[in-house]
UniProtKB/Swiss-Prot annotation:
Gene name for this UniProt entry: mutL
GO biological process: mismatch repair
SUPFAM superfamilies with a match to the protein in the record: ATPase domain of HSP90 chaperone/DNA topoisomerase II/histidine kinase (SSF55874), DNA mismatch repair protein MutL (SSF118116), Ribosomal protein S5 domain 2-like (SSF54211)
Record Pfam families: DNA_mis_repair (PF01119), HATPase_c_3 (PF13589), MutL_C (PF08676)
Keyword match S-adenosyl-L-methionine: no
Taxonomy, superkingdom: Bacteria
Protein role: This protein is involved in the repair of mismatches in DNA. It is required for dam-dependent methyl-directed DNA mismatch repair. May act as a 'molecular matchmaker', a protein that promotes the formation of a stable complex between two or more DNA-binding proteins in an ATP-dependent manner without itself being part of a final effector complex.
MF term (GO), any: mismatched DNA binding
Recorded GO CC terms: mismatch repair complex
Protein name, per record: DNA mismatch repair protein MutL
Chain segments annotated as transmembrane: none
SMART domains according to UniProt: DNA_mis_repair, MutL_C
NCBIfam families, sorted: mutl
């Protein structure tokens, strides 16, 4: 029997390895940008076409490569970053494995043009699917120009699973922003199909954040900083009032590298506990700088998951530095007063006249204890209690109470507990003020049904009602629009702007009027009348949710917009409704076709069956 185990050719092995490193066009962008930074570039330009399917080109002014290095760079595990295993624990570069270029060349058509400062001529190299084509000496600018064309051209299955151009370009922008945020000293620019999307000049860190995400964040950023033997922490955190339900900007960086770290995220959220509304997320940009030997980057192909030697200590430091920053910036109300800010008010000196003491006449013969004004002396209530007639007093009280009871008709249990069925057909659509309900802890309504007791979350119930009203108005084309007194400027990063373009028709159809002002800015001119005061927040939440969920159809967008409008218009949690409001809300809720769940699938009503209640008293 012949042997069945064989060694794979390098081309196939590279394609398999590319599956871990190169997952989509954004993966190529990440690797090429990091290579440019490792080469010492101070100016980096990124060009993409068809969201990276046709072309990804990175141009930099870095060190460049010799012809032999250019050829060797596309071999598997060829790197200039390490020479021994111990070098892994002293890395300051972004790349080190020598897998990226080989993986890219295995699934795309690659062209490299490079030149070093000491060389008069440069090198042009072409590779198609791991096969080296032309290697020539040509004129070339300083640095590197690396073009990746027709990604996954030889792996149709991988190309088929790519998402839409809008989705893939958003992923590219995400990787681009991560690299730009951690390298503010480098100039970046990105072009899509020849059109400039974003141009970032070298700048301080705060300005780089504002250039990427918009100037509206300026008032939200609080600087933080701490130096310790374990790690240095710097960056910015958001004010509590800037916390969002969706689309919060949350970034961790360590030694110039973006990372994900759920444990450190918990530390940030713990620092904001009780000072931001439940369900919201703060913005933060945290930068860690520590010895490379204290972290392990080599645990994931994308190098975004990093282990720390002392994570618990860093967890505590994160909480300390954020709380100090929030406290010192007056973002959190403090109990102590700042005496440095007190106004020095001089003591009142008067008009300058001497105050004359008024004359007082005394009657030396007056004795206030001589006469009491009572006909009889005061007796001790403890010793003389029978004389006060308490028994007679209680007898009179009980007789009066019994007389009032006899005058009132007896209350029957059928009248005390309403028998409302929990079905739309059993309840009139007209709100009734006769429905009995009890407000529990300012959030839940307790009412009676024929099946038992119903516990209703009135915030969610109101949200359901408002959603149904809006959808009914939309179906009748009866949405009332109102112009804003002053148009509101909405600034987005490029990824948000592309989502607005995709959703603008849907927003226009339901009463919003958005006028484009540039690549990533819009003017909000009008909105549905019921949410005119929070229209900008609704638009932002709709866009962020679209980015996260990828909703694109008319029905999905309409449901999303209606849900967000209902969320902002609903009675807030903690605000107790009046008895009439609660009764009307229950009547309208039970008349709805779907009164059990909110539009986003959260439970509204929980029923305690009559049998369960009886069982508790057996």
């Amino acid at each position: 029997m012949s042997d069945v185990i064989r060694l794979l050719p390098d081309s196939i092995a590279n394609q398999i390895a590319a599956g871990e490193v190169i997952q989509r066009p954004a993966s190529v962008v990440k690797e090429l940008l990091e290579n440019a930074l490792d080469a010492g570039a101070s100016i980096i330009r990124l060009d993409v076409r068809e969201a990276g399917r046709e072309l990804i080109r990175v141009t930099d002014n870095g060190k460049g490569m010799s012809q032999s290095d250019a050829r060797m760079a596309f071999e598997r595990h060829a790197t200039s970053k390490i020479a021994s295993f111990q070098d892994l624990f002293s890395l300051r570069t972004m790349g080190f494995r020598g897998e990226a270029l080989a993986s890219i060349a295995a699934v795309a058509q690659v062209e490299l043009l490079t030149r070093r400062a000491e060389d008069e001529l440069g090198t042009r190299l072409t590779i198609n699917g791991s096969e080296v084509g032309e290697v020539a000496t040509v004129t070339s600018p300083l640095g590197c120009i690396l073009c990746v064309k027709n990604l996954f051209y030889n792996v149709p299955a991988r190309r088929k699973f790519l998402k839409s151009n809008e989705t893939e370009f958003r992923h590219i922008l995400t990787e681009y922003e991560r690299v730009a945020l951690v390298n503010p000293q480098v100039a970046f620019s990105i072009y899509h199909s020849g059109e400039l999307v974003q141009d970032l000049p070298p700048s301080p860190l705060k300005k780089r954040i504002l250039d990427v995400f918009g100037k509206r964040m300026e008032k939200d950023l609080i600087p933080i900083g701490m130096k310790s033997p374990i790690t240095n922490i710097s960056g910015f955190v958001g004010r509590p009032d800037g916390a969002r339900k969706r689309g919060a900007l949350q970034y961790f960086f360590v030694n110039g590298r973006f990372m994900r770290h759920p444990y450190f995220h918990k530390a940030v959220m713990a620092a904001y506990e009780a000072i931001i509304p439940q369900g919201t997320m703060p913005n933060y940009f945290l930068y860690f700088d520590l010895e490379p030997s204290q972290i392990d980057v080599n645990i994931h192909p994308t190098k975004t998951e990093i282990k720390f030697s002392d994570e618990q200590a860093i967890f505590k430091l994160i909480g300390v530095v954020i709380r100090e920053a929030l406290s010192s910036s007056n973002a959190v109300p403090a109990i102590d007063f700042d005496r440095k800010e007190l106004i020095d008010i001089p003591a009142y000196q008067g008009p300058g006249k001497n105050v004359v003491r008024p004359p007082v006449d005394l009657d030396p013969s007056y004795n206030p204890f001589k006469e009491t004004g009572l006909t009889e002396p005061i007796r001790s209530s403890r010793r003389q209690s029978p004389d006060m007639g308490w028994n007679e007093l209680f007898k009179q009280f009980e007789a009066k109470r019994d007389a009032e009871k006899m005058a009132e008709p007896p209350i029957r249990s059928e009248e005390l507990f309403a028998s409302t069925d929990f079905t739309p057909s059993a309840v009139s659509a007209t709100p009734s003020t006769d429905m009995l309900c009890y407000v529990h802890r300012g959030r839940y309504l307790v009412t009676t049904l024929s099946r038992g007791l119903a516990l209703v979350d009135f915030h969610r119930a109101h949200k359901r009602i408002l959603y149904d009203r809006f959808m009914a108005d939309e179906s009748r084309r009866h949405i009332e629009q109102q112009q804003l007194l002053f148009p509101e400027l909405l600034e987005f990063n490029p990824s948000d702007a592309s989502a607005v373009k995709a959703a603008v028709d849907e927003l226009q159809s339901v009463g919003f009027d958005l006028s484009p002002l540039g690549v990533s800015s819009y003017s909000l001119l009008a909105a549905p009348v019921q949410i005119i005061d929070c229209a900008a927040d609704v638009v932002r939440d709709v866009i962020h949710t679209t980015l996260e969920d990828g909703r694109s159809s008319h029905e999905q967008m309409l449901e999303l917009i209606a849900t967000q409008i209902a969320e902002y218009q609903a009675i807030p949690c903690g605000k107790t409704p009046t008895a009439e409001e609660a009764s009307d809300l229950l009547a309208e809720l039970f008349a709805s076709n779907d009164s059990t769940y909110t539009p986003d699938g959260k439970l509204i009503v929980s029923i305690i069956e009559e049998a369960d209640i009886a069982r508790r008293f057996e």
